[in-house]
Amino acid sequence: MGTIKNNFQLLWLILLIVVLVNGKSINKNNNNNKNEIINVTYDGRSLIINGERKLLFSGSIHYPRTSEEMWPIILKQSKDAGIDIIDTYIFWNIHQPNSPSEYYFDGNANITKFLDLCKEFDLYVNLRIGPYVCAEWTYGGFPIWLKEIPNIVYRDYNQQWMNEMSIWMEFVVKYLDNYFAPNGGPIILAQVENEYGWLEQEYGINGTEYAKWSIDFAKSLNIGIPWIMCQQNDIESAINTCNGYYCHDWISSHWEQFPNQPSFWTENWIGWFENWGQAKPKRPVQDILYSNARFIAYGGSLINYYMWFGGTNFGRTSGGPWIITSYDYDAPLDEFGQPNEPKFSLSSKFHQVLHAIESDLLNNQPPKSPTFLSQFIEVHQYGINLSFITNYGTSTTPKIIQWMNQTYTIQPWSVLIIYNNEILFDTSFIPPNTLFNNNTINNFKPINQNIIQSIFQISDFNLNSGGGGGDGDGNSVNSVSPIEQLLITKDTSDYCWYSTNVTTTSLSYNEKGNIFLTITEFYDYVHIFIDNEYQGSAFSPSLCQLQLNPINNSTTFQLQILSMTIGLENYASHMENYTRGILGSILIGSQNLTNNQWLMKSGLIGENIKIFNNDNTINWQTSPSSSSSSLIQKPLTWYKLNISLVGLPIDISSTVYALDMSSMNKGMIWVNGYSIGRYWLIEATQSICNQSAIENYSYIGEYDPSNYRIDCNKPSQSIYSVPIDWLFNNNYNNQYATIIIIEELNGNPNEIQLLSNKIIN
């Protein structure tokens, strides 16, 4: 009987036999020999590389979501796990953030270094040029200066947009010319646009024309490899691909429309992103393996995990709005570049098994329709040796079935891969004693020494004589009414001050003599001050209504509104129209202040003087005892922490570091001048958390991230990744690190902890 085996030695003996039969080794990809010219074509069955059909597993790894010294570690682990292709976007707004005349390719924006490493580790690349990327990345990857081009309409048959897109794509192709496969580089696929088919109808006939123009223009660049356009079912001259949690049922309609195109899955959403105020989404590994196996059974030949490694939204790169700094995504490699078990090891085994039977798959056409053994149980057979038996039923009772004179037990929502009557892989099987949710973040420990050497502090209002709230640095704009925030900040800061001088009238007070401020429309978050004294906060989409308390009940005061973005929209049509800041009316009582003459200023003073790079020029207030009572504990306070690094491990392959910000509230962090990102200790209030479901291997039925989450009633994020090369600032003789924090509300920096985790490979 071919019953499910728990004996892994037997499983690997069977796999070895399959390998010998096919004359292949499991790690078969010798794809990028030095200076080898790679010929890439395709037909309806698969991609063909140098004349050989390929079954390909791809992993999304975005180069700017980790530090450049982590790239080799992440890529090596990916290769060892059976990944064939690295999938990455080009992020336009990190390479040209402020103007079309600048180019930035340093640090973790060094795309050529990343591609060199891909080739070094024998990995192909799918380069998704876009230029729209989505990716939960701020503004979908668009540089904000595009908004200033008159009459531009993004992603439309619009001359201004097409001019800018052409210039950027031509530059990218020329800049990366040596990295395309015909020139000996690792890039074997390229993508133009991104998921445009989901929004195309919102652009009408112009959308259709733009989609056609996009691929025609891309092909005119003559890069010598196939172009893809994901979720684009009206274009024949690019390979249309699928994105989603399950894509097996997309294949038949795809081949009906494009019989000469292979079936590629460019985004198997292996988890999901997390918003501030939400609990952590988890996707069961059994469901991922099930979706993979079904896709291959139906004829798919390329699967990309989105994400294979998620990493971190450093700086202000997270999109949304409201997306947290971590982009862990519950990926097989966690935010810190380490295996997320059991997702990593089971995915690796799946790749090894499928690579071993590649020729049996690709040298046979998929069956036109499956064979049904019973309700919910179907078989896809390839030749005489290989079968995929699927139970897509959701009853929790296993089924006993007969196939090819053998008896098998199959679990619900699972696939058995059978070779020569033996089970090579069961997508539902979890080895005994498996630890779930076993990843780096759950194994951090505080460094057992008093590493905070000193704490300094200064209020943003005290950083120059003009004070905060819109005065002081000459970068202010006056207007009768508030101006949309992005026009002021040019997205160089989350923060924008709106200030006006108020003289109250009888209309300002309610019947109890109180003053209430109302802002009818704003995005995303506001802090309210009167004469530099904090009054309260609000965040959209709620109406801002709060009581004001002028100092000494003064009838004249300066009203200061600090507006904040928390990541710019990354998925929408007509993003050229995107606006932030104060967009509605502003009233105190029934006194309308909207046209009261406003002063607007981009950024905090500390940001504008780059306090995180010039901390030695600041007249900091020292807190000798570093006790809570000696701290300012007021909104908009900058803190400087000197942290001892003496005796700490510096081996990037064996240790990872993070900051525990549980004692703080909301703000931003810099370590040695590197922006770690936003922090916010907002609690996850989502009511559906399924820690017990995860521990009990519950995976049956279609996955929905909204009801499969953990860590309710905890902060959405309290642990913040600090790359080791940033912590030691590329100089391992450093004895300390400098941490700069802007705390918007209040907190105790004395209780910030540096955490470490020693990696056991």
From Swiss-Prot:
A GO MF label: beta-galactosidase activity
The protein's UniProt keywords, in alphabetical order, are:
Glycoprotein, Glycosidase, Hydrolase, Signal
Q: Which residues are glycosylated?
A: 39, 110, 206, 385, 405, 438, 501, 552-553, 577, 592, 642, 690, 696
What top-tier enzyme class does this entry carry?
hydrolase
Q: Name one GO cellular component term.
A: vacuole
Q: Where is the active site?
A: 195, 267
Q: Which reaction does it catalyse?
A: Hydrolysis of terminal non-reducing beta-D-galactose residues in beta-D-galactosides
Enzyme Commission (EC) number: 3.2.1.23
Entry annotated with the keyword Hydrolase: yes
Q: Which InterPro entries match?
A: BetaGal_gal-bd, Galactose-bd-like_sf, Gly_Hdrlase_35_cat, Glyco_hydro_35_CS, Glycoside_Hdrlase_35, Glycoside_hydrolase_SF
Q: Which Gene3D superfamilies would you find in this protein's record? A: Galactose-binding domain-like (2.60.120.260), Glycosidases (3.20.20.80)
GO BP terms: namely:
galactose catabolic process
What are the boundaries of the signal sequence? 1-23
Parts of the chain that traverse the membrane: none
* The protein's role, per its UniProt record: Cleaves beta-linked terminal galactosyl residues from gangliosides, glycoproteins, and glycosaminoglycans.
Which PANTHER family does the record cross-reference, listed alphabetically? BETA-GALACTOSIDASE RELATED (PTHR23421)
Q: Which family does it belong to?
A: Belongs to the glycosyl hydrolase 35 family.
Its name, as the record gives it, is Probable beta-galactosidase 2
Give the originating organism: Dictyostelium discoideum
